[in-house]
Structures are given as structure tokens and as C-alpha cells.
């Protein structure tokens, strides 16, 4: 399943992008509680998206979410793998830069 999140023109009111992001995040959290995974996507070919979905020109599509079940259910509850992330101390600055 895919959900397209439409907003008024984000160039006129920037907070619409924040609101769209919040909506996306809460949909993802709600889905996760039901055992459904999700993946957000940013869209860059706006005219193609409008042609495919047929939404009015005064609305803008910037975020799409795909939802589905994992192929292997144990992957949903698997502990996160240790990756090549930087240490917190390397990316966080307290009270001042540096």
C-alpha cells in the first residue's frame, strides 16, 4: 500500500512540510504498532506524480509512504545491527561548537 501526503504550496508556507513530515512519522509509528513496516520516499518528478495520481494543481506531493509486511517476521523484532556510525561524542556539541 502507498500513501501520498499532499500539502498546499510549500513555497508559500514552509510549515506545511513540517506538518507533512509529522503526519508521515505518526502513520509510520501507528503502522509499526500493527506489525506493518514502512518506507518514506521523497518525490522529485512532480509533474509525473500529478499525471499518475490526478491530484489538483493547487496541491503538492512531497512525501509518499509505502507500507507492507516484512518477508520474514523475525526481522521486525530483530535487534538493530551495529553499524559504522560515528560515536555520539563525534557528532554532538554541548553548549557551544567544538
Please provide the spans of the model-predicted regions.
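Acidic, surface-exposed loops and disordered segments
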Residues: 1-98
Amino acid at each position: 500500500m502507498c500513501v501520498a501526503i499532499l500539502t498546499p504550496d510549500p513555497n508559500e508556507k514552509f510549515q506545511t512540510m513540517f506538518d507533512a513530515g509529522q503526519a508521515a512519522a505518526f502513520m509510520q509509528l501507528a503502522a509499526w504498532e500493527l506489525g506493518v513496516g514502512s518506507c518514506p520516499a521523497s518525490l522529485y518528478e512532480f509533474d509525473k506524480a500529478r499525471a499518475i495520481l490526478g491530484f489538483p494543481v493547487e496541491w503538492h506531493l512531497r512525501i509518499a509512504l509505502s507500507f507492507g509486511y516484512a518477508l520474514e517476521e523475525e526481522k521486525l523484532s530483530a535487534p538493530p545491527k551495529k553499524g559504522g556510525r560515528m560515536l555520539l561524542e563525534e557528532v554532538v556539541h554541548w553548549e557551544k561548537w567544538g
